[in-house]
Amino acid sequence: DRAADLNAMYADPEVRAVFALRGGWGSARILPLLDWAAIRQNPKLLIGFSDITALHLAFAARAGYPTIHGGNAASTWKSETWESLWRLAFAADRPVLGGAAGEAASGRIARTIRGGVARGRLLGGNLTIVSTLMGTGWLPAFKGAILFIEDVNEAEYRIDRMLQQLRLAGVLGELAGIVFGQCTSCRTEEPGYRGFTLDEVIDQHLAP
């Protein structure tokens, strides 16, 4: 049903953009069921995050046009977020993302692991989904790209495992840059855990 709905929306010329209602699981299941010829012939924005990463990456590999890693429709949005996405989806012939960062974004703690200037295609999303699609035909080429990643409810050792998978597959070594975003509740709840912290895992994989 989800694949049929998505195919219908991309075949309908009256539909300007497709907003995912929520994330969760299962987006990868529908990839072989999508009409990629119709999707390529009818470009329109796909907006969502989390499990929707599977669709974003497949679109980057198969459709040839960008999508938006942004809020799902069921999320609670600030007014500036909704206004920005509305302009992107409906108010411009050529979508352009711009403007100053909002208060929430500009006030967050950030640190630089490896300094410098990078330019490249922006690819990524949920780290679990990125690593799950490794070795399939649904990933775009990462050479020269800037990879952004986020995740939720994953223990430090699982984050380490997924980053190690990207390293062993050669992905980390061919990137122009990496942005490691929010990792909500990414800590183990196992009693007596004495492994690496999340910061240590990130530094081990991304530091010079």
Regions found by a protein language model. Give the residues of each.
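Oxyanion-binding "anion nests"
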Residues: 122-166
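Conserved anion/nucleotide-ligand pocket segment
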Residues: 64-131, 135
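ATP/NTP phosphate-donor binding region
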Residues: 1-14
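N-terminal glycine-rich "phosphate-gripper" loop used for MgATP/nucleotide binding
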Residues: 17-28, 33, 49
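Short, acidic/small-residue loops that bind anionic groups at enzyme active sites
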Residues: 34-58, 66-73
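C-terminal active-site/capping subdomain that shapes the small-molecule cofactor and substrate pocket
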Residues: 162-208
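A short helix->loop->beta-strand "cap" motif at the edges of active sites that frequently abuts
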Residues: 14, 39-45, 63-65, 175-176, ...
